[in-house]
Amino acid sequence: MNAKERFYSGLAKETIGKITSNTDNWTSFLRTMSRNYEFTYPEQVMIYAQRPNATFCKPYEDWNAENYRRYVKRGSTGIALFVMNRDKPYLRYVFDVADTGVRRSSPELKPWEVTPENRSYVMEAMERTFGVAADGVLEAQLEDIASALAAEYWDDYKKQFLDIVANSFLEEYDELNIEVAFKNAVANSVSYTMYCRFVESPDNYFEHEDFQKVFDFNTRQTVNALGTAVNAISTRMFQEIEKAIGEHEQIKATERS
């Protein structure tokens, strides 16, 4: 590992050591996660550590490609991410949309958005996919889905998680209370991440107590397990929402033609 890789490795460790230390740090990380859900949890940690306000990140070559036809502004600093799928980890770089400029031929960037027009379609699509009824309120439906998926995730990874609670605050709990803490921390964190994309001030919908269990994840292994779970579930949900909005737009376009 060269000096630059050691620096960024240290930055990642430092960030992981802080993100569950208080509510502000954790919710700040969740906001970054909500805007960058296409990335893995370790990549989201690196984005948060370097550019917590980043909203839409792509590699240099992608910005120049046909889909975006944008240029990266001179002097922009890339966000370093570790690539771990080789024998030896190495760094790659992405740039936030704020680092780019438009050309005359650049298409308009339109991030997906839940609107009054597509909200009902999104709720119906989420009910079809996850089997959780909407009852007219998307946010409540998403909270119920988050809870259901947190329970599924626990069932799938229970053994692995119980093996890593040593030296964390969770170590003092029996198995049942570890399960309760895990499901609570994951479900509330996923719900907050969802709210970040649907309401202007997600903090108005949550209390400090909603994240109390997060503080029990206070070792690197338990923080990583929590972050990985929140990433997996929220990404799955965001992808379904994005898909539903795309389908709705196609339906409306067909009706207009």
Name each model-derived stretch.
Residues M1-S257:
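N-terminal accessory/interface modules of nucleic-acid-binding and processing proteins
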